[in-house]
Amino acid sequence: MKREVYLDYAATTPLRKEVYEAMKPFLKEKFGNPSSIHHFGRETRTAIEEAREKIAKAIGAKSDEIIFTSGGTESNNMAIKGVAFALSTKGKHIITSKVEHHAVLEPCHFLEKLGFEITYLPVDREGFVDPDDLKKALRKDTILISIMHANNEIGTIEPIQELSKIAKEYDIYFHTDAVQTVGHIPVNVDELGVDLLSISAHKFYGPKGVGALYIRKGTKIHPLIHGGSQENNKRAGTENVAGIIGMGKAIELAILEMDKEIERLTELRDYFIREVEKRISDVYLNGPRSNRLPNNINFSFAYVEGESILLHLDLEGVEVSTGSACSSSSLEPSHVLSAINVPIELAHGSIRFTLGLYTTKEDLNYTLDVLERIIEKLRTISPYKQEWKINKKS
């Protein structure tokens, strides 16, 4: 019997009922502008500051180090461009990695057009940045290092503590895109040793269109948006009050349930990986088996196109992704899989399954059954099998 199974939690998560209830008053009755000094304004200002405190507490920061944004993309842009513009007289060299989200890579490409030099660090076959490669890439004019906390496609959790120590030795700012980790695994800015950290609410059952950037006190950064004095003069514009309230409630719930969810999702993840590898031949796990996000699974299925698998799964009620949801409409192979040296034929056959709060073992068993049938069907009609074998030999 067909059932609906959502396995694309890395792309976005459903809004929790408790979060919606917390937001509702600020969508209608509590409508005051937080910059107004009358009662309606003070009411929303107080609520925003309470939410800011929740976000700060969740990552071990101070509340005045949290700047609310429109989401992870803006937070990444603000961190990278903001530091670049603030320190351009000191240096114009930035270091990042080849497996970053496009919300980091594209700001770097933009800065290259303005005369900045960007070093894109390689990664190993599991997606890890080598600290020695970072050391070798350092220059006297390096002003920023930006390495993601965990990869959105293959789940690799990077050794941020080790990498940030290198940055500190040379007095270089360190930014991490923690969009996939905040609310899912423990994140503490002091333990990580970072100066800037990006967050997105809709990745942990909060609303879309709201996020935050942690900026360590004393970090020099220029605002991207100019206007009013909101967000400590760092991000102008009337705040998204309901969104911020929802984000605060979502992170509060995520932290309360984190330990239990890590254990549950890790068990489900490992079960799914074992079953896929047992039932289906010529399948390859992309990314590491340990030091991996508890909800992330990425497989390459030989001889078939990932898009065909995705569409057939969709017809069976199973929702998955072929990579980052922000660029999965592209026909180009994933830049992440290319960076870990996955052959192009296998990269085109990749599917990402990401689990979440409402994923059950029954969901996974249903998915396994339909996936097995789909792969078998697609391989019987695939024109790629012989071609792939020829390319593999050459």
UniProtKB/Swiss-Prot annotation:
Designated name of the protein: Cysteine desulfurase IscS
Gene (name only): iscS
EC primary class: transferase
Family per record: Belongs to the class-V pyridoxal-phosphate-dependent aminotransferase family. NifS/IscS subfamily.
Alphabetical list of HAMAP family matching this protein: Cys_desulf_IscS (MF_00331)
Cofactor entry: pyridoxal 5'-phosphate
Subunit (UniProt): Homodimer. Forms a heterotetramer with IscU, interacts with other sulfur acceptors.
Stretches of the chain forming a coiled coil according to its record: none
One GO cellular component, as annotated: L-cysteine desulfurase complex
